[in-house]
UniProtKB/Swiss-Prot annotation:
The protein's Enzyme Commission number: 4.1.3.1, 4.1.3.30
UniProt similarity note: Belongs to the isocitrate lyase/PEP mutase superfamily. Isocitrate lyase family.
Localisation per UniProt entry: Glyoxysome
GO molecular function list: isocitrate lyase activity; metal ion binding; methylisocitrate lyase activity
Reaction equation(s) it catalyzes: D-threo-isocitrate = glyoxylate + succinate; (2S,3R)-3-hydroxybutane-1,2,3-tricarboxylate = pyruvate + succinate
Function, as annotated: Catalyzes the formation of succinate and glyoxylate from isocitrate, a key step of the glyoxylate cycle, which operates as an anaplerotic route for replenishing the tricarboxylic acid cycle. Required for growth on ethanol or acetate, but dispensable when fermentable carbon sources are available. Also acts on 2-methylisocitrate.
Protein name (Swiss-Prot/TrEMBL): Isocitrate lyase
Needed co-factor(s): Mg(2+)
Assigned keywords, A-Z: Glyoxylate bypass, Glyoxysome, Lyase, Magnesium, Metal-binding, Peroxisome, Tricarboxylic acid cycle
Keyword Magnesium belongs to the record: yes
Record organism: Emericella nidulans (strain FGSC A4 / ATCC 38163 / CBS 112.46 / NRRL 194 / M139) (Aspergillus nidulans)
Enzyme class per UniProt: lyase
Amino acid sequence: MSYIEEEDQRYWDEVAAVKNWWKDSRWRYTKRPFTAEQIVAKRGNLKIEYPSNVQAKKLWGILERNFKNKEASFTYGCLDPTMVTQMAKYLDTVYVSGWQSSSTASSTDEPSPDLADYPMNTVPNKVNHLWMAQLFHDRKQREERMTTPKDQRHKVANVDYLRPIIADADTGHGGLTAVMKLTKLFVERGAAGIHIEDQAPGTKKCGHMAGKVLVPISEHINRLVAIRAQADIMGTDLLAIARTDSEAATLITSTIDHRDHPFIIGSTNPDIQPLNDLMVMAEQAGKNGAELQAIEDEWLAKAGLKLFNDAVVDAINNSPLPNKKAAIEKYLTQSKGKSNLEARAIAKEIAGTDIYFDWEAPRTREGYYRYQGGTQCAINRAVAYAPFADLIWMESKLPDYKQAKEFADGVHAVWPEQKLAYNLSPSFNWKKAMPRDEQETYIKRLGALGYAWQFITLAGLHTTALISDTFAKAYAKQGMRAYGELVQEPEMANGVDVVTHQKWSGANYVDNMLKMITGGVSSTAAMGKGVTEDQFKS
């Protein structure tokens, strides 16, 4: 057999293996607009097995079980190795937040609010930071257990440190090739899953900030496809989570996708000029600041801004048509899912006249179209994303169970097996949102709706801030009494393993490696005679 024949044989064998992989139940709801042949052709000759694939499979198993049982895994944003080891005792997943990374871990060390303006390796670096810690503490624990006699081993901790990590990919940090490169970084650095949102990259905001600009549905689907394609090239089961910010978005970059048309706002006043033309003329006339704002406010008040469907309903209600209710119902039924061009034709046929509606006139000075989000808008997007996403998350303004149920019901009416995610955000005022008994059951109630994975994005940040403020304040007044009462004694009382921080850091493990190398004796063992940690032995 010639080299070319052997090369072809290897290629077709690999294509067959990929096709067989895609037949697994893991992919029963996944749509791929590309072929196994295309994926394999983009792989190198050296097959690399990524440890994060083990974690991705583990995460999928957790979520499959949760969704089937109407339960939820819940976690929070982790800051560092100390936190990840403590979380592992009680929680089955770990979250890495872009917000937290932006403020505390940018790869340039320059802190920032959550605008995703940090280098694209920032969050993958934090994932790797935690992943390496997970691997180390897993090795350390295994060594301790395997060197402990069987009859005594039950006394040794047996924590699953290898909790799957889900990380924030923001908007992908650029175009589709940037999304693919970012995905590759996450896979290489230990992520089991990543989420990506449908905001525009240059104007990305925290989900609880104002001024969010969306990209068209089709553009975000391309991002999700890019993630899956890159993961397929690497041969991993990486989970892709689609986040939509459409519930509170007010702007969109383009009208290119007809699925967005029902939510784009236009002017219904034919007697005013486009807003941007008016603003340019005012600037050229020397107006600025408050004067420009007043001109814009006056224009907005006169423009009659509304959705096209609302414009049609108002036109029918103001028309001489005899059965207005029936006409409105007929229009809404026939125009559902149609483009604005098609909806205009339907409206003209029913109302008997053209409906004036101009979505170009109110465009912002940056060129964005005005947009009216909401829960139904988010459902519209989620339904479109579902075939390309393992989970879907709607960012929301409040922890509103009724809204969460409306969203879940809307998605599941089309895709009954779609797993959902929920942000239990610290941006919400939980005390105002609901009483404590409802707070206690909120995760469970959401789990019953299909929100199989839930997370507090910034709990790592807030808990660190709270203990730091509490301790620093007491330490300034009480000296070492504050450390004893607020830190060390509670650590000992609660069995927090970091109280013996030398052992926690792996000093025994490293000593034993040195002794293994030197034949069992080391005069420089870190945990030998004289180590102060002996004070903590009972």
